[in-house]
């Protein structure tokens, strides 16, 4: 029985609908660093790549961003790509762009056909989020609505409410990442993920961050999280597990759940 909801790209299931999907981040500061990182990661065959463009030093030059996005596409061996600008309020790097400039960059990249998913934060102004929804529809990309709290883990009902709000706002996928202060908070995140399956139809991506939170990256999919983020070469968030280690643990858990 499937425990997660599958992600699709242009009508095709990502990685044939396997669960969970493994996503590796690209966090290089310049073109050479991103492409070196990409070469290492592609050899490890994750199911998804996420380009964290807020780490990229050339972010203010839209043409450079688009060209690098195209090069990532050419060199990604067919692995679908998530395009993400993480804001400083949700743990990202400072970039010196207005939100209108960020959306202009998103438009240029999405219209280039170089990416499959757009990650955009629910905490953005409603008019900006509406533009992201419209862009995803226009370009046949999928919109991941995201929420990150690097300070705490909200209660179950608040996390579920965020996920419901993402669906209501027009997202295709709902993502939450929160910081635990103890093991109880990891349980809170897992419970919220399970509860969300009853409330919304979207695929959910959820994770607890930090050392405690690494547990959620290993077995969060059992509770309904469709994607686990792993380290390909460099981590983009605290608590990420190396791809090889994550894959090993997943194989053991999957065999156990099948009674093997």
Curated annotation (Swiss-Prot):
Active-site residue numbers: 148, 175
Domain of life: Bacteria
Residues binding 3-dehydroquinate, per UniProt: 50-52, 86, 217, 236, 240
Pfam families recorded: DHquinase_I (PF01487)
Signal peptide feature range: none
Catalysed reactions, semicolon-separated: 3-dehydroquinate = 3-dehydroshikimate + H2O
UniProt KW keywords: Amino-acid biosynthesis, Aromatic amino acid biosynthesis, Lyase, Schiff base
Gene3D superfamilies linked: Aldolase class I
Complexes and interactors: Homodimer.
Family to which this protein belongs: Belongs to the type-I 3-dehydroquinase family.
Function: Involved in the third step of the chorismate pathway, which leads to the biosynthesis of aromatic amino acids. Catalyzes the cis-dehydration of 3-dehydroquinate (DHQ) and introduces the first double bond of the aromatic ring to yield 3-dehydroshikimate.
Protein's recorded name: 3-dehydroquinate dehydratase
Organism from which the protein derives: Aromatoleum aromaticum (strain DSM 19018 / LMG 30748 / EbN1) (Azoarcus sp. (strain EbN1))
Gene designation: aroD
């Amino acid at each position: 029985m499937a425990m997660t909801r599958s992600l699709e790209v242009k009508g095709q299931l990502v990685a044939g609908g396997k669960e969970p999907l493994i996503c590796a981040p690209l966090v290089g500061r310049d073109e050479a660093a991103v492409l070196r990182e990409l070469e290492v990661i592609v050899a490890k065959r994750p199911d998804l790549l996420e380009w964290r463009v807020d780490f990229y030093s050339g972010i203010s030059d839209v043409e450079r961003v688009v060209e690098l996005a195209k090069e990532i596409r050419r060199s990604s061996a067919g692995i679908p790509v998530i395009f993400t600008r993480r804001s400083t309020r949700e743990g990202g790097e400072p970039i010196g762009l207005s939100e209108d400039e960020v959306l202009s960059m998103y438009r240029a990249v999405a219209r280039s056909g170089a990416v499959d998913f757009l990650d955009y934060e629910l905490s953005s102004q409603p008019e900006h989020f509406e533009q992201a929804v419209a862009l995803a529809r226009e370009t046949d990309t999928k919109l991941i609505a995201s929420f990150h709290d690097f300070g705490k883990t909200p209660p179950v009902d608040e996390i579920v409410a965020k996920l419901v709000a993402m669906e209501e706002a027009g997202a295709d996928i709902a993502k939450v990442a929160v910081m635990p202060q103890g093991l109880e908070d990891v349980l809170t995140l897992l419970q919220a993920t399970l509860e969300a399956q009853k409330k919304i139809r979207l695929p959910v991506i959820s994770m607890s961050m930090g050392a405690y939170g690494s547990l959620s990256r290993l077995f969060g999919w059992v509770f309904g999280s469709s994607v686990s983020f792993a380290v390909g070469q460099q981590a983009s968030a605290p608590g990420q597990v190396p791809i090889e280690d994550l894959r090993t643990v997943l194989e053991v858990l999957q065999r156990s759940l099948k009674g093997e």
